[in-house]
Regions:
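Active-site metal-binding core of divalent-cation-utilizing nuclease and nuclease-like domains
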Residues: 1-30, 36-40
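Core beta-strand-centered patch of the WYL/Sm-like small regulatory domain
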Residues: 28-30, 35-36, 40-51, 60
Length: 145
């Protein structure tokens, strides 16, 4: 799923959630990153780029220690990687979700937003990933969330 080499050890997610295939849904693999401190732009971009283009992940969720940190990471992705990615060009707005829930004020999965800063429901997002094959996923299909 991750397709990372040994030298990419520091680029592995904090944990990986796999929702098994059922009769009505596909297997869904979502990586989670928990960020408590600011990393360099170069390191963040390298990590996000590898998740986007070198893995078979269905999605990635960044849970950050503050709203400022999650916004910084979101803008790095939106401005630097999203416009260039061939693999993510149709679903890129919703491949990464971001949260500042470590900052307090709600459940971790109640405060998720996509690369454009729009609220996204974790349950609906996972449901969409499970019910829609990769080549058919489109960000515009998620506007009802």
């Amino acid at each position: 799923i991750l397709n990372l080499s040994y030298v990419d050890y520091d680029l592995r997610p904090d944990f990986l959630l796999t929702i098994q295939k059922t009769e009505s849904s596909n297997t869904v693999c979502v990586a989670f990153e928990i960020e408590r401190s600011r990393k360099s732009d170069e390191r963040i971009l390298r990590k996000l780029g590898k998740y986007m283009d070198r893995t078979q992940l269905d999605g990635l969720i960044y849970i950050c220690d503050s709203g400022r940190l999650s916004e910084t990471i979101r803008l790095l992705y939106q401005n630097n990687l999203l416009p260039k990615s061939e693999k993510q060009k149709r679903f890129g707005e919703n491949f990464f979700l971001f949260s500042d829930s470590l900052d307090g004020g709600g459940e971790a999965f109640d405060r998720l937003f996509n690369a454009c800063g729009k609220f996204t429901s974790f349950k609906n997002w996972c449901g969409y990933l499970g019910s829609t094959e990769w080549p058919k996923r489109r960000s515009e299909d998620l506007k009802i969330w």
